[in-house]
Amino acid sequence: MMIIDSQVHIWAPETAEKPYARGDAATPHRPIPLGHEELLREMDNAGVARCVLVPPTWEADRNDTSLEAARLYPDRFRVMGRLAVQKPESRALMATWTN
């Protein structure tokens, strides 16, 4: 039986170039960011074959960390991205999100 986790968060460290969202956004689940390599080890240990990455709220509308993981490991990760639907530039992004 294949196990697929339907909601997993990975995130990068907060930096000046990529600050976390403020206000109503949640805070990270733990003080150390969770990257895709660590997640793959955890998935393998738990017998999870694939997962859907959902960018966390504290990364606002950024999807880059999750998209990069899916690009590197397309057989393991898919992304349910976050888009600011009120922004016109988000429409252009929709055309690239086919897989």
Describe the role of every protein-language-model region:
Residues 1-99:
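Helix-coil boundary/capping segments in enzymes
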